[in-house]
Amino acid sequence: EQPIATLSEATLRQSISVVPQRVHLFSATLRDNLLLAAPHAGDDALAAMLCRVGLDKLLEDDGLNAWLGEGGRQLSGGELRRLAIARALLHDAPLMLLDEPTEGLDATTESQMLELISDVMRNKTVLMVTHRLRGLSRFDQIIVMDNGQIIEQGNHADLLARQGRYYQFKQRL
């Protein structure tokens, strides 16, 4: 283990997968949009990941050669979000940072994506920022913040038992 400040940019990029709140779609092929995260991935791995995130319909016409973005197929917000999750999972880093990864997804798709992330990232570190409480029982540690301050932390069961802010949020659902 070494301090993060001593790591090179290349090492940091290799070590971290990110699902940003604002996902960028490049005007390029579907393949190119995925290879950004995993440059050496084969077509089978790319197609399999698209299927895992529920985007297999993107493969129907031109497959991985389908043009996305300007001059090509536009993606809905939910499709864009799932493409970002596919990129992050393909990157296969030991640390994943997620910023509102399921924003705009319906409840069923949100549950599927959180289950997939949990499965693929087993024994790895996931840091997720969210305002939604669905799926948090899968996490080992939950930190509840208010105005930039930590007000509670623990696992799902502990936080419910304390009947604090997390419990109050859950009661409102």
Where are these regions (language model features)?
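ABC ATPase NBD Q-loop/coupling interface
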Residues: 1-11
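ATP/adenylate-binding site constellation spanning eukaryotic-like Ser/Thr protein kinases
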Residues: 9, 13, 55, 163
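ABC-family ATPase nucleotide-binding domain "signature/switch" substructure
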Residues: 13-22, 30-33, 49, 66-162
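Conserved "ABC signature" C-loop
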Residues: 23-67, 116, 165-168
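ABC ATPase nucleotide-binding domains
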Residues: 171-173
